[in-house]
Amino acid sequence: MAIILGIDPGSRVTGYGVIRQQGRQLIYLGSGCIRTQVPDLPSRLKRIYAGVSEIITQFSPDVFSVEQVFMAKNADSALKLGQARGVAILAAVNNDLPVFEYAARQVKQSVVGTGGADKSQVQHMVRSILKLSAAPQADAADALAIAITHCHFNQNLLRVGDPRLVLTRGRLR
């Protein structure tokens, strides 16, 4: 059983999603957005750091998963996104969480089945996978999708030297 925190970083809106993995079952614990209303970037970064730290304290996740920075058409936007991502990762590292990174196309492929999926498709599949009554807001859905992707990619994560691993039918389990 593991609690996974997914983060969809943004300099104005940072989405978060928390799920628990119990075997093959994924259980929704919470999601939302950290909104930064202040105009200056340093204050926004401070709010993102504080918000992510608060979420970590509230949910006590075992793992932190975050979307990788993609190349934006606007270099200034990409730099701001990278800074927002950096303070979110810093909050995780300061709380001794392992950090895992996933590309946006990888997340969409994992959750929807195609790397070119749009936001509404991601929202729909997150709702379906986690059995939610309504689709989460786009940024929160992206964060939940990142957490789901971590579960998919690490379902059979091998820990070298783990004495509990047993070779069964050609697979380490």
UniProtKB/Swiss-Prot annotation:
It comes from the Bacteria. It catalyses: Endonucleolytic cleavage at a junction such as a reciprocal single-stranded crossover between two homologous DNA duplexes (Holliday junction). Disulfide bonds: none annotated. Its main location: cytoplasm. InterPro entries: RNaseH-like_sf (IPR012337), RNaseH_sf (IPR036397), X-over_junc_endoDNase_Mg_BS (IPR020563), X-over_junc_endoDNase_RuvC (IPR002176). Transmembrane segments: none annotated. Pfam families: RuvC (PF02075). Binds 2 Mg(2+) ion per subunit. PROSITE patterns: RUVC. Mg(2+) 1 binds at residues 8, 139. One of its GO terms (biological process) is DNA recombination. The keyword DNA damage applies. Mg(2+) 2 binds at residue 67. GO terms for cellular component: cytoplasm; Holliday junction resolvase complex. Its cofactor is Mg(2+). It is found in: Cytoplasm. GO terms for molecular function: crossover junction DNA endonuclease activity; DNA binding; magnesium ion binding. PANTHER family: CROSSOVER JUNCTION ENDODEOXYRIBONUCLEASE RUVC. Homodimer which binds Holliday junction (HJ) DNA. The HJ becomes 2-fold symmetrical on binding to RuvC with unstacked arms; it has a different conformation from HJ DNA in complex with RuvA. In the full resolvosome a probable DNA-RuvA(4)-RuvB(12)-RuvC(2) complex forms which resolves the HJ. Belongs to the RuvC family. This is Crossover junction endodeoxyribonuclease RuvC.
